Amino acid sequence: MSYSVGKIHKYSVDLYQSLEEETGQHVSFHKTGNLRLARNQERMDEYKRYCGTASTIGVPFEMIGPAEIKKLWPFAKVDDLVGAIYHPDDGHVAPVDVTMALLKGARANGAETYSEVEVTSMAQKPNDEWVVSTNKGDITCDVVISCTGNYARETGRMVGLELPVVPVEHQFIVTGPIPELVEYNRAGNPEMAVLRESDSSYYMRQEADGLILGPYEKGAPCWALDGVPEGFGQELLPPDLERLEPHIIAAGERVPLFETAGIKDHINGPIAYTPDGNPMVGPAWGLRNFWLSEGHSFGITAAGGSGRHLAEWIVEGSPSIDMNGVDPRRFSAAQSTRDFIKAKNEECYEHVFVIHYDFEERSAARPAKMSPIYDRQKALNAAFGQRYGWERPNWFAPEGTEPFNKYSFRTRRTNWFETVGEEVKAVRERVGLLDLTSFTKHEISGPGAEDYLNKMIANRLPTTQGGTVLGHALTASGGVESEFTITRDGDKFFAVSSGSAERHDHDVLLRTLPRDGSVSLKNITLEHGTLVVCGPRSRELLSKITDADLSNDGFPWLTSQRITVAGVSLLALRVNFVGELGWELHHPIDQQVQLFDSIVDVGEEFGLRHFGMYAMESMRLEKSYRMWGSDLTREYSILEAGLSRFVRLKKDEFVGKEALLMQKETGVPQEFVTLEIDVTDADALGSEPIFRNGEMVGRATSGCYGHSIGKSLALAYVKSGNGDIGTELEIEILGERRSAQVIPESPCDPDNLKLRA
């Protein structure tokens, strides 16, 4: 479960239980609980992983056995079950009733609503107001929020957006009255929990004296790929009972009285989906005052929380929770094509109940974006992962080993664990080569560029030619919006940021761009590749193919130079994300193959090894380096993140300064810590709860095994007062609490001697 989505759903459930009292409008909230069944230990381990996240969000749950399941669902067979996870506060509501209650509450607070209105076009005025044209006249407004369900793609195109939202057909069956349920209800028994048979991919719940069965079957097609038919409203689609047959049989085996029940209704309707199944909630990229709340495959479950946190974002400038998991800007243009959406949305639908493994890489719509050396990496037995549409090597399988992740909670240690350890060892002891072409890259130039960037980031810009700094764009509350490595390159600045943040960071840069033309912003991500050569022998290797002086005096740490490597003119930055002597080589993309081949040819002499994202992750945790999107989010301030060294509070002006000054005076509510964990076969990954003396005091944001130091590590936020070095804590991993200790940052090379070598 995504942390963002979990927070949104939690707020919705809480809201719906109080909405009727607040508005006087009945919402038909049935607090029945939610029961997820498990037929094997693998499924139970998935639930344990989920429970860790649920704890950090505040969602109550119980892990129960077959006897407790039978009490909650007396009509279910339980003899083949291992157990279940039970959410007592969950249930179901009537979407129409919730909608009416929200409307009533909005009207009571001054909102105006209009029905039977068709939007025909939208246009923005020079003063940023929007004119929304309808079949009943124009509406001029400051802000537009697009919540158009199955019409999302058409709505987006009205304002020049290609939204990766397309409906998928979803069917469910409603039975007629079932004698046993009639008798059960007459006896005054409570309504049974919503039943989810994950291993057979369906949900079931009571509907008066009958049952509803909702399968998530394979082969469910996308609908209206080329546009919703004109005039389509609440109409239903032709049912396909044959697709549901395996699920109907499975439901009858689990609940025998369903097998003999008569079908009252068979309904097939479209549900809006995105490629990852999460909604798109937040600002639309490239537009001012235009917001999205689209792709809600969870339906009414997300309405309350999405509305709340979107309102915060619009009114206060930032949501109070981490919304990266639902931010519309998480998708690239390559992930918004017709073919990509069709393949991924259908895959996402049929995987709703499939076990969600750690490090899972699904196969649909791949490859979408590749660096020019993709074929060479494939020939080297690279095991690829996809992020933001990019194919990136996660690890390189040894000869004779299939380059694919094998998934199992039971095995705990993965099939790539040893290989990644060898990649780390090679980088730490010799030299490694990493492809980070997916990095987001921008050029910022013009007479106003320096002033513009200085007001955006909390750090100072580099003052010397070739100087490089880490700079953070903050929210008004001091949370981290974006992270950039910024280099002064001649008469311009070169900014590098996360590969998954291209659309997000371009939008962040664009929103504060002066309108007087004094600053030019250019996204050069696709024009330039990035290869990283790092390790103690990286200087020796590169010196074989460049005439540049790579010595400490000639090319100090945290600087950059325009140099020629293997005949390729490029920008070299003496920085990296693994904590070793090394250089990022930012080069013209059309010369990547030439550069790569030369490095590989020369590298043989120095024991060069290709390494992937998993090895990089291990090494960056050994350095306590924060990752944007997991360790650095809007939810925690940059001071809470322990990055005060990148904040210059004496600067005249930057976004978030006032909030940080106040927090510095009052103290931070959370502290960022590095943890060493006592584990044997499973590591933290992020979102695990952290305890002290039985009380939950924080959550992990990243975790993995540190191969260089032979320790399991995690990065985490804990309540202030729990972060002193040596503090003994516990962290829950797959349902087991493991001992953890707060250790000093950067357990590998704490004095940065390797970086400065």
Specify the residue positions occupied by each region the protein language model found.
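Central beta-strand plus flanking loop segment that forms part of the substrate or channel wall
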Residues: 1, 34-36, 161-187, 246, ...
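Dinucleotide-binding Rossmann-like beta1-alpha1 core, especially the glycine-rich loop
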Residues: 1-72, 199-204, 208-212, 346-358, ...
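Glycine-rich phosphate/pyrophosphate-binding beta-alpha loops
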Residues: 3, 90-95, 199-201, 268-274, ...
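A non-catalytic, amphipathic alpha-helix used as a structural packing/dimerization or gating element
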Residues: 4-18, 49, 101, 243-246, ...
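Flavin (FAD/FMN) cofactor-binding and adjacent substrate-gating region
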Residues: 15-18, 22, 30, 39-109, ...
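Flavin-dependent oxidoreductases
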Residues: 121-237, 246-254, 339-361, 365-370, ...
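C-terminal catalytic lobe of FAD-dependent flavoproteins
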Residues: 199, 208, 230-369
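Glycine/proline-enriched, intrinsically flexible loops and inter-domain linkers
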Residues: 321-322, 328-757
